């Protein structure tokens, strides 16, 4: 196939809906862990890394919350407690409210 076509659905990349379909099938869990020296880390897990670009999502979340973070396996870890705003920010990104569990 040409480089302008999606290898999964066969549509042009501009019309590709694979990532939206993948977002609808995710079950996302958001929790806060306490690390060394009392530091809090918000952990967002339940993503399928083969269907969603976690590095792009991590960059988006870090800029929205103005914090540092990383991708470890199929989870995104953000420095600080962002539990209260995480659901609305993920909904802005295209995930539905039913998929996100605190």
Curated annotation (Swiss-Prot):
Source organism superkingdom = Archaea
Q: What is the name of this protein?
A: Protein translation factor SUI1 homolog
Which protein family is named in the record? Belongs to the SUI1 family.
UniProt feature coiled coil, ranges: none
Instruction: Please give the Gene Ontology molecular function terms for this protein.
Output: mRNA binding; translation initiation factor activity
* Native species: Methanosarcina mazei (strain ATCC BAA-159 / DSM 3647 / Goe1 / Go1 / JCM 11833 / OCM 88) (Methanosarcina frisia)
GO BP annotations listed: formation of translation preinitiation complex; regulation of translation; translation reinitiation
Q: Write down a Pfam family by its short name.
A: SUI1
Q: Which SUPFAM superfamilies match?
A: eIF1-like
């Amino acid at each position: 196939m040409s480089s302008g076509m999606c290898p999964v659905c066969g549509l042009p990349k501009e019309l590709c809906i694979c990532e939206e379909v993948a977002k609808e099938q995710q079950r996302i869990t958001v929790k806060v862990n306490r690390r060394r020296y009392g530091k809090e880390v918000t952990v967002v897990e339940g993503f399928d890394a083969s269907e969603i670009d976690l590095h792009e999502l991590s960059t988006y979340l870090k800029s929205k919350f103005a914090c540092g973070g990383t991708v470890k396996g199929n989870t995104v870890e953000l420095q600080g407690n962002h539990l209260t705003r995480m659901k609305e920010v993920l909904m802005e990104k295209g995930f539905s409210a039913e998929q996100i569990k605190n």
